[in-house]
């Protein structure tokens, strides 16, 4: 039996956030935690373009984005491509959002809360049973 850290599933993250300071904070925290931030964007259109040409392991998206389309629209499109989405928002996620995202991390959150949330999502994507971290609501189960 091997002991040690399990290999991460989530390594490359796309941040989609319309608030510049929050986007910068997310970028900094993710880099500090050892994740590769593929890009930080503020709109559905830019995110969809990138999803079509980059390998992304997870999208960290606000519900409200610049432009006419929302994080919910982005989550629908990402799910069609097999890319999981974790919402990060201070708003309630509608039922439809719960059907297309892996979960939601409530704003505001600390680096530790973000780390715990991403570790929980990673374990969930690996098919493990997961207890949600503080401020995190998970929408899928390992059996889903």
PLM regions: where:
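Two-component/phosphorelay signaling modules centered on CheY-like receiver
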Residues: 20-39
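Conserved phosphotransfer microenvironments
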Residues: 61-79
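A Lys-centered signature of the CheY-like receiver
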Residues: 107
């Amino acid at each position: 039996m091997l002991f040690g850290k399990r290999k991460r599933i989530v390594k490359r993250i796309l941040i989609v956030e319309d608030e510049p300071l929050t986007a910068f904070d997310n970028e900094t925290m993710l880099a500090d935690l050892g994740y590769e931030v593929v890009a930080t964007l503020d709109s559905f259109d830019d995110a969809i373009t990138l999803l079509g040409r980059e390998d992304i392991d997870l999208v960290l998206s606000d519900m409200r984005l610049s432009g006419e389309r929302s994080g919910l629209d982005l989550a629908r499109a990402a799910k069609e491509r097999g890319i999981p989405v974790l919402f990060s928002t201070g708003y309630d996620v509608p039922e439809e959002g719960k059907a297309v995202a892996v979960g939601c991390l409530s704003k505001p959150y600390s680096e530790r809360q973000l780390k715990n949330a991403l570790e929980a999502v990673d374990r969930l994507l690996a098919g493990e049973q997961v207890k949600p971290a503080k401020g995190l609501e998970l929408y899928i189960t390992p059996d889903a």
